[in-house]
Regions:
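Short beta-alpha connecting loops at secondary-structure transitions
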Residues: 7-9, 75-76, 134-140
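C-terminal substrate/ligand-recognition segments
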Residues: 137-167
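Short acidic (Asp/Glu) and glycine-rich catalytic loops that position anionic groups and cofactors
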Residues: 84-88, 132-134, 150
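Generic long, charged, amphipathic alpha-helical segments
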Residues: 121-147
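Composition- and surface-driven signal marking solvent-exposed, interaction-prone regions
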Residues: 104-106, 164-169
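Short intrinsically disordered, low-complexity coil segments enriched in acidic
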Residues: 1-4, 169
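Catalytic cores of carbohydrate-active enzymes
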Residues: 2-3, 12-18, 22-111, 115-123
Length: 169
């Protein structure tokens, strides 16, 4: 299983956080379904455990408090350390984060993802903002823009992380 995050993203066989998070959740749910229909859930639970351990060992950047976007499979096997918002919200939505990781990952969005102030006549003056999907340069359509579904899914991630006030803004 994988996702379509953008028509401008290409990962060359690497370890990708959002895809791995989806695969973790899929295996976790397959274990629940297997148990309900009388099948053995063990292979799915074991696979989910392996995926979660790999996510934390290979892609969690403890010094930065978020997951890497991906680790390249070839060459120097470098980590792409500037995650897009889809990496954060898919990880939280797929329940791969512990509470502290969830807090740290949303703090990454607070501090590293561009925020565009929202102001309007009649709107109370607060720190309302919308966000870009990444902090990547040079600008490329579809990987560094404001997409309402991405903004809403990121807001949901804040609620899932226990930070509803920040998610509302």
């Amino acid at each position: 299983a994988c996702i379509w995050a953008s028509d401008a993203l290409y990962y060359n066989s690497g370890a990708v956080t959002h895809s791995s998070a989806y695969n973790y959740r899929a295996n976790k749910m397959a274990a629940v379904i297997a148990e309900k229909i009388g099948e053995d859930p063990t292979p799915y639970r074991e696979e989910a455990g392996k995926i979660l351990r790999a996510l934390n060992a290979r892609l969690w950047l403890s010094d930065r408090g978020h997951w890497a976007e991906y680790q390249d499979y070839m060459g120097h096997r470098r980590l792409h350390e500037s995650a897009g918002v889809w990496t954060i919200y898919h990880a939280l939505d797929s329940e791969v984060a512990d509470p502290f990781q969830a807090y740290q990952a949303t703090r990454y969005v607070d501090t590293e993802i561009p925020h565009i102030p929202v102001r309007a006549n009649g709107l109370e003056e607060k720190d309302y903002a919308t966000i870009a999907t990444t902090n990547w340069l040079p600008y490329s359509w579809s990987v560094n823009n404001v997409a309402f579904a991405e903004v809403m899914h990121t807001a949901l991630a804040y609620f899932q992380a226990g930070r509803p006030e920040a998610g509302y803004k």
